[in-house]
């Protein structure tokens, strides 16, 4: 038997029906149109939470990527600065080597060897580090952003490492590299010429790997300077080679002018050496030769001793000539007694001619008088001082003139010439002006003289060689090199222009 459901209105009373209608009307009146049912609230709450979590995750990911991009940019800038500084320092080393070669006269630097292989970091773009974010989607997005960043901004280090064939990714302190460097160093030592001394003759040779790798061969430096070119993003080569950019004509001009003060091979100035006298055979035929024993009279100075003609010992304007034989100490020097401190030159070589007042000035004759001048009971010291005149003693005796006149080449007429008693202090002071060690205030150095010559309006009409020879005659030696007075430079310039 089937059950048939009955309607509620069939069994409810009329009063109950009125109450249910009122409740239905009240419920419809309180609810608003469009409001979702209550059973959907838990689902919407979960959706809002998921959206907030995704938003926070994206913000954290963007913040992390921005920090990584800033770090990459800083590292790229530091790498570019380091490479630029390396190229600049290498160019400076080449310039200093060339300058050193000019002064030393050779380009052999056997004890300055560096390794030809320098180990450094590999290509930074070959190894990308993916940021792990906890989800596969996040890791893929972060790696893609890093790849896009590297594609947009290529690193300059990659271009340098790709275009620099002089570098290799090898450890400079490896065993193979050390053996190669030792072999190269031995070959360089065999190629060193015997006449050229090393820069550091007493340098200690260490066998540690660090010191071995701090040695630089000239071939390795030249190879690095010529082969290493920094290539930027636009592939513009900037070769920092300043080898032939200095001293176009200043170097030969100054080298020729520096001959006035001597060079490395000839320390004595050339123009004074060429004007020096021929080899002189010095004998002992002086007026004082009778004081020497016959054994020493047979000795004559050989003509092959060239230091007698050296301008350093026998200058044109100097007062000191060393025309004595110092090679053989066993043979007595005929004029050695003149070097004795107890020997009075003024009394020995004074004027022997008697004066009118000699009888009064003779101390021996005064002893025979009735009233002796040396009587201890009387104070006659004033009489003695008044009788002896200062002219009786030759105070202006010049020992150098006496030695010059005593030599055979000075005695052409066979007679002894008395030494000159004129005062030579003024001449000596004038000649000493040419040997001033500190530079005078109004002088010009070689580079300043060359600047003044090249800035002259008639520079093309000047005879540079002739002007240089004239400047050498006016040159002075100082701690700064050759210097010439400004007035002399201007005078010689005007004279050369008139010619």
Curated annotation (Swiss-Prot):
UniProt KW Disulfide bond keyword: yes
InterPro entries the record matches: AP-1-like, bZIP, bZIP_sf, TF_PAP1, Yap1_redox_dom_sf
Region of interest (Leucine-zipper), ranges: 68-75
Subcellular locations according to the entry: Nucleus; Cytoplasm
Annotated segments matching region Disordered: 1-64, 104-215, 408-442
Annotated knockout phenotype: Causes hypersensitivity to cadmium, 4-nitroquinoline N-oxide, 1,10-phenanthroline, and hydrogen peroxide. Abolishes the peroxide-mediated induction of COR33, TSA1, and many other genes involved in oxidative stress response. Inhibits trehalose accumulation upon exposure to oxidative stress. Shows significantly reduced viability when exposed to whole blood or polymorphonuclear cells, as well as to the Chinese herbal medicine baicalein. Also leads to decreased virulence in a Caenorhabditis elegans model. Increases apoptosis upon apoptotic stimulation.
Name of the protein described by the UniProt record: AP-1-like transcription factor CAP1
Taxonomic lineage: Eukaryota, Fungi, Dikarya, Ascomycota, Saccharomycotina
